[in-house]
Amino acid sequence: MLKSTLSWVDFSEHDRDHMLQVIRIFAEPETVDELGIGSVRDALADVLFPGTSTIQTRAAYFLFIPWIYVSLEGRRASARDVAELARRREVQLIDALAASDDTRGVIGIEARSKLKRFPSSIYWNGLGVWGIRRFPGSREQYHRSFASSPVGPGTVLTNDDGEPADGVVRWNWHPALPDPPPGFPRRASFRLRPDDADFLQERIQSSAPNSYLAFLVGEGGIFSPETVLFPWQHPRTAHAPELNRRQLAHARNFSLVMHGAALCYNLLLVEARLALRQTDADEERRDTYVDMLEQWWAEVKAWTRVVQQWDMTSFWATAEQGNPNIHRRTRYFVETWLAFVREHLRGGHPVDRLVRSQRVVDLLKERERQLKGSRARFYNPHALDGWNGRSGADRLNYRWPVVSDIVLDILNGFAEGEFDAATG
């Protein structure tokens, strides 16, 4: 059997970041995008929380990476040497964070020097989106730039005669980047200083001033992530700008409506496998999905007016702000499923009638066939037999677990300054 491998060409870091998110998603059974709606989910997440990704962890990495690279600037070196120097310092950073009093979210805490993808790669695109990274290319291109000429903060661009080119100054990193704390990276912590928090807040609000993320780091206030499980549950959502509230409403509606499609898909798969062989595990799964669908339908009915009046033209316009290339088949699938939900709401039907509708069954089977081809479980007994029993059955949260950590890190950085002032 041929071994499948991935080889990275010189992608933009955004493309690479997206690909790694896809790989991670397919490694996590509960978040697998079985119905091909991930492009819509990610588009909405980019609108709400620009610069973030599911493979990020803590806000301080938006400072750690520039600090490491700024410390390397001002020297002439090969791309390989720069990459190795940066790698060593990132390993030092891992060790320092692992020894700190807050190890949650330390990237590479287990792998250490054997880590395959370092934080500099994970955060590179987000650093550009927030305007912290001014260098316009990929991380590899940045490494190569060291070989052509010593790069450094405030480097003056020159013309072919070696003279200043119109007084242009090239900044690879934002000139207001705070200095690292003493001993970095051998000593490091996720705890932000007030100046760190202020810088990150300013970068978010300047680079994405109309985003919900900008509102959260500015006026959102401290909240409990244990009780705020989705972005629209934030206690200050009602105080957000009208644009953000509209975006959140679209995200909430999409999450609610499409959750039913995912649950229905899982139930139909379990029943298809039970038709081939009876197992206690699958019978328990079937009962679980039936219960989850009942709960979902009760919630949908509670939101009947919202679901029936949901403006899909406005929804797609919002999603297109994050991704203008959402496939027409994805649009068709979403709108057809929504039409079935609305039809059954109008008729006052129980959820079982929706699930047993042949049109619904055909829609889900055809969607899986479009996405998986010969590997579609509805048509491939071997694939069905190897299924783990749960695929993409969770509600869409638009990276909220990661985003909430980043937001709270920044807000707690301001609180740290207030505490120091009060006790000083």
Regions found by a protein language model. Give the residues of each.
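Non-catalytic recognition/regulatory regions in large multidomain proteins
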Residues: 1-424
